[in-house]
Amino acid sequence: MPATGKICNFDCIYCENGFNADRRTPDAFVTLPTLREALEAKLVEMSSTGELPDVITLAGNGEPTASPVFPEVVDASIHLRDEYAPEARVAVLSNGTYADRPDVHRALLRVDDNLLKLDTVDPDYIRFVDRPAKGYDIEHQIEVFASFCGHVIIQSLFLTGTWQGHDVDNTGDTYVMPWLDALRRIGPRSVAVYTIARDTPAAGLRKATPQSLDSIAKRVRALGIDCSASY
């Protein structure tokens, strides 16, 4: 992703990188040679100090899989990991909207940790809080996530509060029960539930309580799916 702004097809009201309109950039995605050189330089530096990374994460201020060279970036990251930090894992944090593209799907199958976003399955909530680009279809996303046959970690953010006079609490049964049904269909390796940890561009948002997150995580584990909760 470019360092000068944000490129994303979601415009989440809780995004720590701000609203898309406030972070527009004339710059394109980082090129493959630039990324490869930067990653190798960092790994060489870390290797010299004996402090190698546990995880190499492809994320950034936007949607990494939107990059036209995303599959090549994955291959380069795996190659450099194997050369300099063979014990490290390669992870991708994604909203999953490009995971139905064959080249992106294959690339996500190659990484160790394929983390895909699913905050809720309620279309109105998604439109109001996650604000994806036109054409987003939650049923299609669930089917795509299930197509990884377990090679997927679902990341779900829970929060409370209000925005523009509307309640944005997705910790209650109205949202959690259908979300649990979606997890059954997806069959992920694990689930990570968490809440906001930094300032958000939208005012009025609040953290989900540890008690709420623990309760949600317990219900996921009852499905036979490993689940972590971060406060």
Predicted regions and their residues:
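Conserved Radical SAM active-site core
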Residues: 14-110
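Local cysteine-cluster metal-coordination motifs and their immediate loop/turn environment
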Residues: 3-19
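A generic structural signal for well-ordered alpha-helical segments enriched in polar/charged residues
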Residues: 41-44, 79, 181, 185, ...
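Short acidic, glycine/proline-enriched helix-loop-strand junctions
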Residues: 152, 160, 202-231
